[in-house]
Amino acid sequence: MRTGFDRDLYVRMQSQHINERREQIGGKLYLEMGGKLFDDLHASRVLPGFTPDNKIAMLEQLKDELEILVTINAKDLQRNKTRADLDISYEDDVLRLIDVFREAGFLTEHVVLTQLEDDNYQAMQFIQRLERLGIKVARHRVIPGYPTDARRIVSEEGFGRNEYVETTRNLVVVTAPGPGSGKLATCLSQIYGDHQRGISSGYAKFETFPIWDLPLEHPVNLAYEAATADLDDINVIDPFHLTAYGEKATSYNRDVEVFPLLKTMLEMLSGSSPYQSPTDMGVNMVGSAIADDEVCREAARQEIVRRYFKALVDERRDELDDTVSSRIAIVMSKAGCSVEDRTVVARALELESETGAPASAILLDDGRIVTGKTSALLGCSAAMLLNALKELAGIDPSIDLLSPESIEPIQTLKTEHLGSRNPRLHTDEVLIALSVSAAASDNARRALDQLKNLRGCDVHTTTILGSVDEGIFRNLGVLVTSEPKYQRKALYRKR
């Protein structure tokens, strides 16, 4: 895979720039970390060479000087919001993040629930769960007039109603499972609380996307717009930066909307603001570490198309209108890409048309496309997986990695003893069968050794995947899209 991003340069530059901002601010610094802090899979897809743990690697250089504060929007608990890339709820992701941060040696003791209301039963239950686990919880309330009514917000009737988090270090990283979690409001509330206690503190923002020093409609920035289409976030030219410096910089609507509040609040608390624009608040050095712009552009265009298919599937699965997919269609148009640019789509659809049954296609790293069709023994994704492993291992396509005799007993187990209606093997079942065969078969061993080479490959299926196949592909690091239709008609769908 071609690399478009210099990871080592980024780690050095970013940690240095954060330290420079700390010196500039003085006192305690609340650093809002946008995007995923530990496993930023979106960034790794649109910036080839950016590893999912890049931000943690950078923060490890500051580990002994910082603590991490995790926020979650209480309304996301009511909505049962999930992280699509990991298929876990935001509630569980909060616990997972705390575990990950602690295992890496970061001080992580507090969770802030934002936009909390007394009738939010799910949030109250989560608070009890956190407290039973020994995690300190701060409750931040819905503030009428936020973010426009600065005088009310910066008062006892606004931030004054929020519970204050007693932090112990001078660099506080504020992160969350996803966007819209209230990270900025948490930082501002803490600065207000510090001011009431005579503590000097300031704010800076580390948001990977949009990248401020790339053009507004650069595909990498547009991919972020596609990723947040459900929030109706849009990239904008920072009007405050343009006015103050006469320079164009890329920001996004929520930062621009809340900037007057931040500036007013800092002026109310300390007499002046160090920032003239939302862009000034940022410490993001990602743009400076892009080593090959065209590689990143193409990766971003592919991500936008993947987001489009995901939106279509979500709308079909959850019986939603086409609001999100329509927004992403507009983004695709801006980026100059379409579903035809995802080459596996046409191949999968062609095979489905030829066979009259669901089909799959995978694009290998060297450009070869391998397909899989539905048969009496295998589902199309399982067949495609075996075919891809044979191709990578240089095994003759006519050779069966799994004999019909080894598959049939598994089918009998499924249908006669485990209550399955579908006798065909799924991806997890063929991998287990392949692992068993590897004890006696050199071909099976060689095929299994190629699993690592599937990471980052693109797959398209002509029907919506079941949860098992979806999970296997996710664990293998395969980037899957599907047509927004089910293999069979039914009212009940197992999730």
From Swiss-Prot:
Pfam family, any one: DUF1846
Gene3D superfamilies per record: dip2346 domain like, Domain of unknown function (DUF1846), C-terminal subdomain
Listed InterPro entries: DUF1846 (IPR014999), DUF1846_C (IPR048441), DUF1846_N (IPR048496)
Family label: Belongs to the UPF0371 family.
Protein name: UPF0371 protein CE2832
Organism whose genome encodes this protein: Corynebacterium efficiens (strain DSM 44549 / YS-314 / AJ 12310 / JCM 11189 / NBRC 100395)
